[in-house]
Design a protein with these regions (language model features):
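Conserved beta-strand termini and adjacent loop/short-helix elements that scaffold enzyme active sites
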Residues: 50-52, 87, 141
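Short, well-structured N-terminal submotif of metal-dependent ribonuclease cores
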Residues: 1-49, 62-75, 128, 143-146
């Protein structure tokens, strides 16, 4: 699917972990696909993330002792233009239902529940298992074209 078509009608986009890692670490396989999306985030789409996105992004940098990379993730995800949605009891209950309905791992179900609570129309990921979810437009990075 073409990136512009994929983002048509999207005003709030949930960012799963992988696309953020591709963007910050400049992954050569995916950076040409995520850059245009992140440019749109600065212009006319609101990015939404959860504590799971932030903590999963930080794991590799912390494990390797790369404080500059750790800070780069924090800088991207904690900027004023990014909506950071905390996971509360209501989201946890929704995640349990989503996990059962779609047979997802709990972190994925929490991410989807957070996106729905935040009013996102689309969810950017590279996890094809999430394509089972029907309440959101699931955008798989590896299936997008510029």
């Amino acid at each position: 699917m073409n990136i512009n078509d994929a983002l048509t009608g999207v005003s709030r986009l949930f960012l799963d972990t992988a696309p953020v890692i591709y963007f910050v670490e400049r992954n050569p396989h995916f950076v040409d696909l995520v850059d245009p999306i992140f440019e749109r985030l600065e212009a006319n789409i609101t990015a939404v993330v959860s504590p799971i996105t932030l903590s999963e992004c930080l794991v590799g940098a912390i494990r390797l002792g790369l404080t500059d990379l750790e800070q780069a993730f924090v800088d991207v995800l904690e900027q004023d233009e990014v909506v950071f949605v905390d996971i509360d009891a209501s989201i946890a209950r929704d995640a349990a239902r989503i996990r059962v309905r779609y047979n997802l791992q709990l972190p994925d179900a929490l991410q989807v529940a957070t996106a729905l609570t935040a009013g996102c129309e689309a969810f950017l990921t590279n996890d094809t298992a999430l394509k089972r979810v029907t309440e959101l437009r699931i955008l798989v990075v590896g299936e997008l074209v510029v």
